């Protein structure tokens, strides 16, 4: 019997990418589906959604409306992920042609969903931490691995706890087995995923070996033929000295750290319920630079959070100057349902928010120009992962710079030493030596 065709579109974070891989695995290995990039020939169309900001939610309905217009007769449409979790039945009301809704904490139910009319699985307390998913990966050379699900921080601006539920760590034996299998199949790098990865080990579904995130990194680094370990996202509150020292000293741990700042103002951080102060954040970031001089630090910043004054914004700019981030993901505050910040009275006007975001991004661009210029004539070890147009190939350094050289597909999955000849903001161009 010929395979049915599956089309999937993934929006949002790396955890969504891994969730999509899990659903692809379940459907291709258990339900006789094969992936297609042509939506018109698909028997099943999935969109895996993000709800961290308002814009992706609006995009969902425009996307599924487009799917309905081009899909073939009899094809099913499923809405999955975080937006599915928090909108639930509203999706059926606004888009009655959707066949099922599957929340971010319920992706293991995908085979049930495709067989049940108007199936809705949005239970954020459902526990998938020990579910044995079938295996599928978009990349042979890099493997995403979930180490926890959910988040219990309840930052006042964030909807994630309402869409992914409380935090539960995945048992070490499951993580280790998945990493080992990925390496045996050719992965050179594993990428550990969780909302707060360095809070790992605080809560399991059942009794399991006690270990924290630093221990997990050390244990996984013993896997033979595994060359690199990356992770996202750690929480600044849990960046103790042990964690920073393991990060700096373990040669398999990539020297790229995501440190979500959100705001440089201690008052705004308190209103956000982040759990740390500006002083704590700077202490951790500067200690990291001291322990690991070649580290690249990325961050998330929200401008115009309710009540943010000009002084508060200047505190954020001060952290930018002191830490000099290699990369920032910056946004205007986006009001999200079910969050405390959405009901705060002192919302910031759009003009002020846009001005602050522009000021932040323009200054960071200047800093980044200075940073990348210093990379010229340096030599980096690069893992090549992606073909580019014009007989070019790209990969990443240990500290997460994107590097492009002339080369063909025979370089995919290989490490090569590259000398940087021309450094741009987004890409470092170089030559293999």
From Swiss-Prot:
Cofactor(s) it depends on: [4Fe-4S] cluster
Pfam families assigned: Radical_SAM, TRAM, UPF0004
Assigned GO CC terms: cytosol
Domain TRAM residues, every copy: 373-433
Chain positions recorded as [4Fe-4S] cluster 1 binding sites: 13, 50, 82
Keywords associated with the record: 4Fe-4S, Cytoplasm, Iron, Iron-sulfur, Metal-binding, S-adenosyl-L-methionine, Transferase, tRNA processing
Broad class of enzyme this protein falls into: transferase
Catalytic activity: N(6)-dimethylallyladenosine(37) in tRNA + (sulfur carrier)-SH + AH2 + 2 S-adenosyl-L-methionine = 2-methylsulfanyl-N(6)-dimethylallyladenosine(37) in tRNA + (sulfur carrier)-H + 5'-deoxyadenosine + L-methionine + A + S-adenosyl-L-homocysteine + 2 H(+)
Residue ranges annotated for the Radical SAM core domain, each copy included: 137-370
Enzyme Commission number(s) of this protein: 2.8.4.3
Top-level taxon: Bacteria
Family as reported in the entry's similarity comment: Belongs to the methylthiotransferase family. MiaB subfamily.
Cross-referenced NCBIfam families: miaB-methiolase, MiaB/RimO family radical SAM methylthiotransferase
The protein's name in its UniProt record: tRNA-2-methylthio-N(6)-dimethylallyladenosine synthase
Originating species: Campylobacter jejuni subsp. doylei (strain ATCC BAA-1458 / RM4099 / 269.97)
């Amino acid at each position: 019997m010929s395979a049915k065709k599956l089309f999937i579109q993934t929006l949002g974070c790396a955890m969504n990418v891994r969730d999509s891989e899990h659903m692809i695995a379940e459907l291709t290995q258990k339900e006789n589906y094969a992936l297609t990039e042509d939506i018109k020939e698909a028997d099943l169309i999935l969109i895996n959604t993000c709800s961290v900001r308002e814009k992706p939610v609006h995009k969902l309905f425009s996307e599924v409306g487009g799917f309905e217009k081009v899909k073939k007769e009899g094809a099913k449409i499923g809405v999955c992920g975080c937006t599915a979790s928090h909108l639930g039945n509203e999706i059926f009301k606004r888009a009655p042609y959707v066949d099922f809704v599957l929340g971010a904490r319920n992706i293991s139910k995908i085979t049930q969903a495709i067989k049940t009319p108007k199936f809705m699985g949005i239970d954020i307390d459902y526990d998938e931490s020990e579910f044995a998913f079938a295996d599928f990966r978009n990349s042979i050379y890099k493997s995403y691995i979930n180490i926890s699900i959910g988040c219990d921080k309840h930052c006042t601006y964030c909807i994630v706890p309402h869409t992914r539920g409380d935090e539960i760590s995945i048992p070490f034996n499951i993580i280790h087995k998945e990493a080992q299998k990925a390496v045996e199949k050719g992965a050179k790098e594993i990428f550990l995923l969780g909302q707060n990865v360095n809070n790992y080990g605080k809560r399991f579904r059942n009794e399991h070996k006690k270990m924290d995130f630093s221990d997990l990194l050390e244990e996984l680094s013993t896997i033979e033929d595994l060359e690199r370990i990356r992770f996202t996202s750690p929480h600044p509150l849990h960046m103790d000295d042990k964690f920073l020292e393991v990060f700096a000293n373990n040669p398999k741990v990539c020297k790229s750290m995501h440190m979500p700042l959100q705001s440089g103002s201690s008052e705004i951080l308190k209103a956000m319920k982040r759990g740390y102060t500006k002083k704590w954040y700077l202490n951790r970031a500067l200690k990291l630079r001291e322990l690991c001089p070649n580290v690249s630090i990325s961050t998330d910043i929200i401008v115009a959070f309710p009540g943010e004054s000009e002084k508060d914004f200047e505190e954020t700019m001060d952290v930018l100057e002191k830490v000099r981030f290699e990369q920032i993901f910056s946004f205007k505050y986006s009001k999200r349902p079910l969050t405390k910040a959405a009901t705060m009275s002192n919302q910031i006007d759009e003009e002020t928010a846009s001005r602050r975001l522009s000021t932040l991004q323009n200054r960071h661009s200047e800093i980044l120009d200075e940073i990348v210029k210093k990379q010229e004539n340096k030599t980096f070890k690069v893992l090549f992962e992606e073909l580019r147009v014009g007989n070019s190939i790209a990969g990443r350094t240990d500290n997460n710079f994107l590097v492009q050289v002339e080369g063909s597909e025979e370089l995919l999955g290989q490490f090569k030493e590259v000398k940087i000849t021309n450094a741009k903001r987004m890409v470092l161009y170089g030559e293999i030596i």
